Each structure stands twice: as structure tokens, then as C-alpha cells.
From Swiss-Prot:
Residues holding substrate: D229, R344
Protein known as: Methylthioribose kinase
TM segment ranges: none
Keyword Chaperone: no
Binding positions for ATP per the UniProt entry: N40, K57, E111, D112, L113, D246, A247, E248
Catalytic activity: 5-(methylsulfanyl)-D-ribose + ATP = 5-(methylsulfanyl)-alpha-D-ribose 1-phosphate + ADP + H(+)
NCBIfam families, sorted: MTRK
Family: Belongs to the methylthioribose kinase family.
Function statement: Catalyzes the phosphorylation of methylthioribose into methylthioribose-1-phosphate.
UniProt source species: Pectobacterium carotovorum subsp. carotovorum (strain PC1)
Subunit annotation: Homodimer.
Biological process according to GO: L-methionine salvage from methylthioadenosine
Length: 400
């Protein structure tokens, strides 16, 4: 019989007292439910002075924004905890610390990051964290290299692919990225004024063939242990610091998916800034986003190459020049997945504040159309966008 039960605030406090690693656990007295996501309960556990000390996160057996009609496996809580623990082995400075996890209760205790801010919220406000892009590139390089065939022993990797098999969460990604936006589906959400733009996507045979190729890669390329949902809403930032959270979509997949999703969220902000800020501030913010993209890719690729030079364990993959060739394919994949992120975040189920928080209707629609158009361009042109400079040139040419 399952021991699972949905936590109340009191349950969360008691659990944190037992497993939060706090020196005086009896000082933990209150829980504040802060979860604004779709899949989990999240509690801040506070002491007698009102200071939040640890986080208790519990997976729900259904998609929260839909309800019990969309059930979900609780095993995703184990996968999230084990993904974060694995990533923390290789990049502890940029991975949230897991203090304890219990697969049966689908619950995890994490370090409190109240002194950090969600990166997306900061980007929407126009706040700049100039170190964040390089730190995200470092996180991606360390976690993806060390769980790839370059570094991981083949026997260990094959076992890990099984350990992190995540079919239900992958199904969500497969549907939301590669299927729903290109068909009529009840999960899709967009303003009626965008109907002609959406229909044009659905009628675009070349686009749908390119998306099919990206989906096929997502299904078949077990290249490394991905975060699986690495957008600006799953990243905490503070001055000089960055931490990745929310890894329940973790699985072994194409490295370009994580890289492309990260770049895509910077481009979503780029598309939204003219509707969020005054013209001069928006223009300056856009230049910072493009520089963030350049920094992210250059940091990721340089670190991945350095790691491959020094830590590759497979003698064939360690051949001089091979890692650079491999990264060319990662780059092409990343540009394509970036495009699908732009499209699905604009017309699919899970939208972003970078676009949806724009108050003026015509400005919001213009920014959304830009995201759709740019996403289409990147999916189609990915094989021909040779490097990050070419990508930034395409973005600048995209107008709006």
C-alpha cells in the first residue's frame, strides 16, 4: 500500500523539522504555500522570527492547472531529486541543494533561496544580472559533459538512461513542443487575433517537417542527463550567483534541447521588451539579451571543449577535433529547439510573462507575432545558421 498523502502546511513543517538539517528544528513553526507552478506543492518553512529556512516540495498526482483529469506519475519527484543530486556533483555552485528526498511520499527538502530572485521576473522588470548567462553556460557545460558519452562509462550511462527514463513528463514536452502548436488542440491558448498566424504555421509543410526532425531527435538522442525544462522561470539569480531548480523533466536526451530552451527564453524576453519597457530601455535591454545569448553559448562551448580535452574517457571520442564537430551538431539542434520554444510559449499551453504581462493589447499582439515569426525562422533555418553571430544577425533582421 502506498504511503503517499498530500501534505498540509502542518505536515510540511513537521517534515522539515525531521529532515531539514536545521540546528534547532523546534524553531520551525509555520509553512507558507508558494507554489505557482503546475505540478507541485511548494512550502517555505519559517522559524519563529518569520525567516524562511528550508523548502519542502511535494509532487502532486495530477497537473495542478488542469486537475485530476490529467493524472501524473509521482516517480517524477524521484527523478527530479536524483537529477539535481547528479547535477550538483558536477556543478554544485549552480544547482539547488537537495537536503533530503523520499520517493514514496514524492517529497523533497531543499535549501531556501529567499535571497535570490526568479530570473524571468527580473528580466521582465528590466533588471540586469550580467553574470547570469556565463553561469548558466557553465552549469550546462558541466552537467551535460559529465553525463555524456565523452565522460560517463558506457555501462554506467546505459544504467543511468534507464534510471532517468521519464516517459510521462517527456510526453508532456513532446506534445507541448512538437505536436499541439501545429494542430487544433484544446490545450492551445492564444488571442483570436493571432488565428491567421497560427493557421499559417499549421499550413507550413516545410516547418512541420523540420519540427518532426526535432521531435525525432528528442525521442532518440540519449546524449546526456538534461535538466529538461531549463527556462528563466526555473533559474534563481542573485548578485554574482545563479541556481537551477525544478528538474522534474530530467531525462537522457539531446544536449541541444537544454541549450536551445535556455536561449529561447532569452529570445522570448527580447521579443517582449518593446511591450514591457519604454523605447530606450527596451532597446538597451534587447542588446543585453543578445549579448547574454552570445555569452551563454561561448561559455558553454568553450567549457565543454576544455572538459573534453581534459576529461574525456572514451578514446575514440577523445580524438582531437571530434568534440568541436559534435558541438556543431549541438548548435544546430539548439537553434531548432529554440525556435520551437518561441512558438509553443506563444500559442501553446504554458505561456510566459515576458509576453503575456504586456498590458496594451496591440503591443502584446505585435510582440507575440514577432515571437511566432522568429520561432518559425529559426526552426527552418537552423541547418544554415552556422554560429552564434549568424543567429544574432537573424534575430536583428527579424524586425518588430
Amino acid at each position: 500500500m502506498s504511503l503517499y498523502r498530500t501534505f498540509t502546511a502542518n505536515d510540511a513543517v513537521e517534515y522539515a523539522r525531521q529532515f531539514g538539517g536545521v540546528s534547532q528544528p523546534q524553531t520551525l513553526v509555520a509553512a507558507e504555500e508558494i507554489g505557482d507552478g503546475n505540478l507541485n506543492l511548494v512550502f517555505k518553512i519559517k522559524d519563529e522570527t518569520g525567516v524562511s529556512r528550508v523548502i519542502v516540495k511535494q509532487a502532486l498526482p495530477y497537473v495542478r492547472c488542469v486537475g485530476e483529469s490529467w493524472p501524473l506519475t509521482l516517480d517524477r519527484a524521484r527523478i527530479e531529486a536524483e537529477t539535481l543530486l547528479t547535477h550538483a556533483r558536477f556543478c554544485p555552485q549552480h544547482t539547488v541543494t537537495v537536503l533530503y528526498h523520499d520517493p514514496e511520499l514524492a517529497v523533497m527538502v531543499q535549501e531556501d533561496l529567499s535571497d535570490h530572485r526568479i530570473w524571468r521576473s527580473e528580466l521582465v522588470k528590466g533588471a540586469d544580472y550580467p553574470q547570469a548567462a556565463a553561469q548558466l553556460g557553465e552549469y550546462l557545460a558541466q552537467t551535460l559533459f559529465h553525463t555524456s558519452d565523452f565522460h560517463q562509462h558506457p555501462h554506467e550511462k546505459k544504467a543511468a538512461v534507464s534510471q532517468f527514463t521519464n516517459p510521462e513528463l517527456c510526453q508532456i514536452t513532446e506534445d507541448l513542443f512538437f505536436t499541439d502548436p501545429y494542430i487544433e488542440h484544446e490545450r492551445n491558448q492564444f488571442d483570436a487575433a493571432l488565428t491567421p498566424d497560427v493557421q499559417a504555421l499549421r499550413d507550413d509543410k516545410a516547418l512541420k517537417l523540420a519540427v518532426a526532425g526535432l521531435k525525432h531527435g528528442f525521442l532518440s538522442k540519449a546524449e546526456a542527463l538534461l535538466h529538461g525544462d531549463i527556462h528563466s522561470g526555473s533559474i534563481f539569480v542573485a548578485e554574482g550567483r545563479l541556481k537551477a531548480i525544478d528538474a522534474e523533466f530530467g531525462f537522457y536526451g539531446p544536449i541541444g534541447f537544454d541549450v536551445g530552451t535556455a536561449i529561447g527564453n532569452l529570445l522570448l524576453n527580447y521579443c517582449g521588451l518593446p511591450g514591457l519597457l519604454a523605447p530606450r530601455e527596451a532597446a538597451a535591454g534587447r542588446e543585453r539579451r543578445l549579448e547574454d545569448i552570445r555569452t551563454l553559448w561561448q561559455t558553454f562551448s568553450a567549457r565543454f571543449l576544455a572538459l573534453s580535452d581534459n576529461e574525456s574517457r572514451d578514446p575514440a571520442l577523445a580524438e582531437s577535433g571530434y568534440a568541436a564537430l559534435f558541438l556543431q551538431q549541438v548548435w544546430r539542434d539548439a537553434v531548432g529547439y529554440c525556435g520551437t520554444e518561441l512558438i509553443r510559449r506563444t500559442i501553446g499551453l504554458a505561456h510566459v510573462a515576458d509576453l503575456d504581462s504586456i498590458q496594451e493589447t496591440e503591443a502584446r499582439l505585435a510582440c507575440q507575432r514577432h515571437a511566432i515569426s522568429l520561432g518559425r525562422t529559426l526552426v527552418l533555418a537552423a541547418p544554415h545558421i552556422a554560429d552564434v553571430d549568424a543567429l544574432l544577425a537573424r534575430v536583428r533582421q527579424s524586425g518588430a
